[in-house]
């Protein structure tokens, strides 16, 4: 039910109204004690058809602890009984809460008054998919426990509960919210969504990344067959524009001159003297994506250079749907499609990250390479840059006040990406000997065995993989 329920006689047919009356009258309102922290809880009166606080509600509240900003303006979509809205209002946030279920709006208003925060909580009927509904322009934080049930639940839920709990049939509510965020240029807003992508691929967070939004996981919990994850999304640098050049010798050299504050990156339409690892020539053609990022060296206090490089590779590979060859090659169907380069300068306190991606497949010096038209389609270099910018920002952008992902998580993600190639039957050799790759260290080096000898491989010069 995508339209509002302000006039039930207009919004629901006779059978739906009868079902709603039967469903609502079969139960009474219930009182829930919802624990908002170790010391305090709030009492919530929850009418029939209104979503009560459950494990996912607690997980969402836990995830919001990873947003380290002063209270401002918060919007909650799908407020249900008002649990999240009231908890954040008690922290000092000014909350605008929306729900398509009018009983949820009434419940949120009543529960806010009981909690003593009705002066900071405004509850209104409406939400994503409603005609003429828009996100409040002053929102600092938008929160939504996304509907996760299959839309094929007719006659199981009441119509109003169905509207609140079931996903949109065609594209999914996540993508509809993304459209609103892009249309209304919410560049300075952080979106925090509780998503279930295991059984609902329409809620994939990669949809946001591929539209230029960085993401960071705040909390995760396995519930039955599903993984529920609280994810924060934001525009890299809160929408700040990269430096753009029509032509340059090297974006890595140009990156030395970028300001030493904020989210800084530079891209060029053409690069004449690009370089790869240890000064190797990086060949690029018109239309390729060539860019460099300049990040404060203090980020290395969190991630070692080796782990940072493979983590960036893993994040980019996840966004593009390609594979990673340790330590810095991006691979599509056994052919290189791009590469990553890291350089640091202790004198100016920065680390520079260079990324080059081929747009079209080709051949050079007898070696064939792939291009993104084969795995993403016909997008231009600026659109590709936005994806890469979002992927790198997910790790390194400190513009938003969001907790960084733990090193061990990136170590696990990177190892999982490396395994995609290793599991295809490739032959790995180190120092001329065939080896079995068994893990990735916290420093980003490979752990390997040959017979009874253990190796930790940190230099690619003595290492090779044959497809």
What are these regions (language model features)?
Residues 15-87, 224-229:
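SAM-dependent Rossmann-like transferase core, predominantly class I methyltransferases
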Residues 59-135, 143-144, 150-151:
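Conserved SAM/SAH cofactor-binding pocket of Class I
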Residues 144-174:
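Mobile active-site "lid"/loop adjacent to the S-adenosyl-L-methionine
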Residues 173-219:
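Conserved Class I SAM-dependent methyltransferase catalytic core
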Residues 211-309:
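N-terminal lobe of the biotin/lipoate ligase/transferase fold
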């Amino acid at each position: 039910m995508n339209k509002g329920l302000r006039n039930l006689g207009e919004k629901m047919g006779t059978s739906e109204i009868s079902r709603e009356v039967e469903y609502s009258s079969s139960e009474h309102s219930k009182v829930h004690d919802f624990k908002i922290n170790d010391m305090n809880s709030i009492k919530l009166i929850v009418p029939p058809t209104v979503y009560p606080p459950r494990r996912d509600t607690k997980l969402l509240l836990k995830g919001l602890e990873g947003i380290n900003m002063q209270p401002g303006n918060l919007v909650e979509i799908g407020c249900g009984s008002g649990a999240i809205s009231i908890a954040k209002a008690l922290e000092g946030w000014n909350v605008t809460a929306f729900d398509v279920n009018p009983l949820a709006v009434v419940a949120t208003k009543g529960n806010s008054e009981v909690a003593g925060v009705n002066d900071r909580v405004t509850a209104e009927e409406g939400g994503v998919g409603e005609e003429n509904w828009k996100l409040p322009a002053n929102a600092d934080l938008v929160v939504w426990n996304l509907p996760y049930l299959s839309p094929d639940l007719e006659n199981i839920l009441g119509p109003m509960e169905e509207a609140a709990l079931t996903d949109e049939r065609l594209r999914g509510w996540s993508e509809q919210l993304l459209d609103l965020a892009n249309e209304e240029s919410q560049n300075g807003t952080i979106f925090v969504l509780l998503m279930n992508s295991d059984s609902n691929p329409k809620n994939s967070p990669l949809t946001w990344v591929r539209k230029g939004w960085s993401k960071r996981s705040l909390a995760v919990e396995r519930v039955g067959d599903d993984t529920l994850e609280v994810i924060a999304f934001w525009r890299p640098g809160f929408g700040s524009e990269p430096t753009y050049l029509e032509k340059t010798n090297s974006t890595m050299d140009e990156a030395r001159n970028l300001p030493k504050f904020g989210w800084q990156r530079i891209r060029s339409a053409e690069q004449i003297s690009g370089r790869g690892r240890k000064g190797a020539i990086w060949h690029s053609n018109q239309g390729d994506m060539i860019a460099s990022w300049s990040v404060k060296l203090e980020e290395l206090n969190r991630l070692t250079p080796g782990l940072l490089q493979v983590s960036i590779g893993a994040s980019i590979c996840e966004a593009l749907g390609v594979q990673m060859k340790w330590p810095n090659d991006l691979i599509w169907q056994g052919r290189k499609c791009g590469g990553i380069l890291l350089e640091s300068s202790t004198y100016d306190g920065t680390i520079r990250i260079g990324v080059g991606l081929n747009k079209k497949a080709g051949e050079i010096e007898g070696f064939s390479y792939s291009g993104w038209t084969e795995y993403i389609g016909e997008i231009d270099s600026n659109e590709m840059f936005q994806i890469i910018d979002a992927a790198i920002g997910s790790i390194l952008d400190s513009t938003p006040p969001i907790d960084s992902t733990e090193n061990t998580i990136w170590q696990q993600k990177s190892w999982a990406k490396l395994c995609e190639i290793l599991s295809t039957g490739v032959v790995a050799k180190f120092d001329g000997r065939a080896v079995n790759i068994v893990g990735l260290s916290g420093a980003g080096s490979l752990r390997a065995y040959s017979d009874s000898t253990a190796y930790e491989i940190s230099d690619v010069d003595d290492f090779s993989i044959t497809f």
